[in-house]
């Protein structure tokens, strides 16, 4: 996969040079290319923003250098183009799974000042990560890349890790423990040390359902639930009413 990122602050992306993203890049599973669209400004000062038509506070990023930068990317017409902006729908795991199927993504980092509305004519979709304000879309772009890389074949050392992570099955992940067996007054649940794989599976599934029911009940509407799951949820619901 190729991911091109249009930004005014390429230095912010140093975080992608570590951990799983770096390993995926080293294995040529993903190629990330940064483009500073300031270099495509026609002004001597390389200014990329200007006053807003109609007046108002703040400056607006011009569409001209953005589109020029976009068109400089080989294969941009066939690539799936994304703008990060609070006007878009909230980014979720389902969207990450969808984007992971593209061979070429282009992400345009929005800016708190706003971008000329005409940029929407040059992108395929807009995404947001929440109802709050960031200085720019750089952090959003990094989050998108990180979430996608985890879904690419061979990017994770253990593919089972992917299927059991929170949200992948529309459930929060079950609680996990490691050594020591006892820390202060807190012990690892006995069932996890029993060696009984079926009991461990049932325990983990029950705890995932319980955690989701209590913390993120909205996810249950989209989860794939078995008859066993529904019985457990009924039990959890009755216990919550006591």
Predicted features and spans:
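Internal, active-site/partner-interface "lid" segment
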Residues: 139, 151-191
């Amino acid at each position: 996969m190729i991911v091109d990122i249009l930004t005014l602050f390429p230095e912010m992306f140093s975080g992608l040079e570590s951990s799983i993203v770096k390993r995926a890049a080293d294995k040529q599973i993903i190629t990330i290319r940064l483009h500073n669209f300031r270099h495509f400004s026609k002004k001597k000062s390389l200014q990329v923003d200007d006053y807003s038509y109609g007046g108002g506070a703040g400056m607006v990023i011009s569409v001209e250098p953005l589109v020029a930068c976009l068109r400089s990317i080989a294969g941009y017409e066939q690539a799936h183009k994304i703008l990060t902006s609070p006007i878009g729908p909230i980014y979720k795991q389902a969207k990450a799974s969808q984007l992971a199927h593209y061979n070429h993504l282009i992400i345009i980092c929005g800016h708190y000042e706003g971008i000329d509305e005409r940029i929407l004519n040059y992108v395929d979709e807009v995404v947001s990560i929440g109802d709050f304000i960031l200085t720019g879309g750089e952090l959003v772009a990094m989050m998108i890349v990180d979430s996608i890389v985890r879904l690419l074949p061979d990017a994770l050392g253990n593919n089972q890790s992917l299927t059991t992570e929170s949200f992948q099955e529309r459930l929060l992940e079950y609680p996990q423990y490691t050594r020591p067996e006892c820390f202060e007054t807190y012990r690892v649940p006995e069932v996890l040390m029993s060696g009984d794989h079926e009991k461990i599976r049932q325990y983990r599934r029950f705890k995932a359902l319980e955690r989701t029911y209590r913390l993120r009940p909205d996810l249950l509407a989209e989860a794939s639930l078995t008859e066993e799951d529904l019985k457990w949820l009924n039990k959890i619901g009755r216990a919550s009413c006591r």
